[in-house]
Amino acid sequence: MTVRWIDDAASVADADLLVLPGSKATVSDLAWLRDSGLADAVAQRAAAGGPILGICGGYQMMCREIDDPVESSEGLVEGLGLFDTDIAFHPDKTLIRHPDGAYEIHHGRVVRSGDPGWIKTHDSSEVPGGAAFEGNAKGSLRGTHRHGYLEHDANRKEFLRWVADVRGKQYVIDEAASFHAERERQLDLIADVIEQHWDLDALLGEL
């Protein structure tokens, strides 16, 4: 699997999965998407049935309307309209830790949705309004406010199977793969490089 950061419209159609990541400035970043031509490319991909995942701010961009008096001076703006869902920002930030390790930290809240939810909540109190599902799932589109949802091995494997199915491709899941074990391995590699190339005694002596 290869992950690429892209900033050109031509690359949007080629990916098996397009991810619109989190953003601390949803409205202004959405304006950049439009100015760069990426918004049109995202809409074309959605119309063609290409899988798209929006996470937090990326999910908010995929919705119909965004009303943000908290982090933006633009007022009510049109989203990409991929979900029939409206977002309103609230001064009180939503802070939730979910049982699978995923978490939410955002001002934007779903105030109306005409599309099916995606992730079943363990407790209706997890979602403002007591909804039984969080996020949206429509066709080849998925959106959630949850960061780290795919760090949970079972969640990720199920999601990647879905992506492969939508794309009509064979994808063999490594059932033994562990996100947390791999993250620890990568952190150990970074620590080894730092220990090898930095004079830690000198650095610590300055503290």
Predicted regions and their residues:
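Terminal amphipathic helices with adjacent charged low-complexity linkers/tails
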Residues: V12-L20
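Amide-donor transfer/coupling interface in amidating biosynthetic enzymes
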Residues: M1-S11, A39-A47, D86-L207
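General beta-strand structural signal in soluble alpha/beta enzymes
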Residues: W5-D7, L20, G54-I55
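Cysteine-nucleophile active-site neighborhood
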Residues: K24-G101, R109
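Residue-level signal for inorganic ion chemistry
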Residues: L18, C56, H147
